[in-house]
Amino acid sequence: MGAVAVTEQAIVNEAHHRGMQVPNRPKRDDGENTAAAGAYVAFPKKGLHKWIGSMDLNSLYPSVIRALNMDPATIIGQIRPDISEARVHEDTTLKKKSFAGSWEGKFAVEEYDAVMEARKDVALTVDFENGNTEVVSGAELNKIIFDSNKPWMLSSNGTIFTTEHEGVIPGLLKRWYSERKELQAQLKKAKDAGNAIETEYWDKRQLVKKINLNSLYGAILNPGCRFFDKRIGQSTTLTGRTIVKHMSAEVNKVITGTYDHVGEAMIYGDTDSCYFSAYPTLKNDIDSGKIPWSKDNVITLYDQVCEAANTTFEKFMLQAFHCPKTRSEVIAAGREIVAESGLYITKKRYAALVIDNEGFRTDIDGKPGKVKAMGLDLRRSDTPVFMQEFLSELLLMVLTDKPV
């Protein structure tokens, strides 16, 4: 069975376990538009940067689906995407942009923005699952969702979900997440006991659960899946974009005082992570000796920055999506790497000299750290070994500021 078939059967089994009937596989129109906006990837601030930190959201897409209770049976309605589809059509036809290019720098559909800005001058058509259709202004819909005590949440795709009952898909993800935690606990026991065989066994078991968790989103966005629903797929990616934008802006605010996702402290953002540096903001105080600066101090500082940003998700989820605390608590992030330096070239192409990875020091045994390289083709199979070694050595010299 492929990943889609495995995921589909797991959802069917979960539904049957709840005593629910599963609908037959729907017939799909070959001409149906199934493309959905993908993950947010920022353009990096190109060049060599000093003292980099990164903050990473935990299991972003599974967590988004759980937080907003995304499931075909929990959809209340959909704001008709007339404005956003017209913009995409214009971009892809008249402006000759790709579909992905049309979503460059976008974090939500225009209809969602109209609701959040409480626009009185924008009329929105809402198609409800019960067959009703209503035309309301952005301001009116904002009041209905956020001020009327309805158990509704609004995704960045303009899809309205209920909190009255937990959907099958979020429930399945919750169970898988819990099972993975149990397997990771067994893995830790095996590691602590020094049992190599059991360590390998439990590591593979927890890895399978991780794959299950991360592949579910892709499966339900596959038109071949029985539970395919573009509204859920694009709700996941766009809501994820909105959350990552907030995380980046909040990290920048902690460091510089300005809420800006591309502010002075921000270097790069990719899917569920943001890369930042406090060094440019603090450089004068560091040079004057006002702020003590060492590897240990930087690690402590960046831990504090990420902890401060992480505390803001609960309030943000309520304000941005009307997501209650009981559901938003799954949205969490933590500090990932601290690097002494990093080279950023373009999207998906960068390298960093990591000195700490999630609390584990890598600058040990006389080593300056561990090089994390993405998209630089240092280890291509068609490149001779001596050239691979030369390129790796050259990159390390750049990152350690040694003469080339």
Predicted segments with their positions:
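Phosphate/diphosphate-binding loops
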Residues: 91-132, 299-335
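C-terminal polymerase-core module
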Residues: 275-404
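Glycine- and acidic
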Residues: 41-50, 157-170, 185-202, 221-237, ...
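Common nucleic-acid-contacting/processivity interface regions adjacent to the catalytic cores
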Residues: 1-79, 85, 89-97, 195-250, ...
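Intrinsically disordered or highly flexible coil/loop and linker segments, enriched in small
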Residues: 17-25, 66, 70-77, 182-193, ...
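Extended, highly charged clamp/arch subdomains and adjacent linkers
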Residues: 20, 24-52, 59, 63, ...
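Active-site palm subdomain of RNA-directed nucleic acid polymerases
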Residues: 244-271, 283
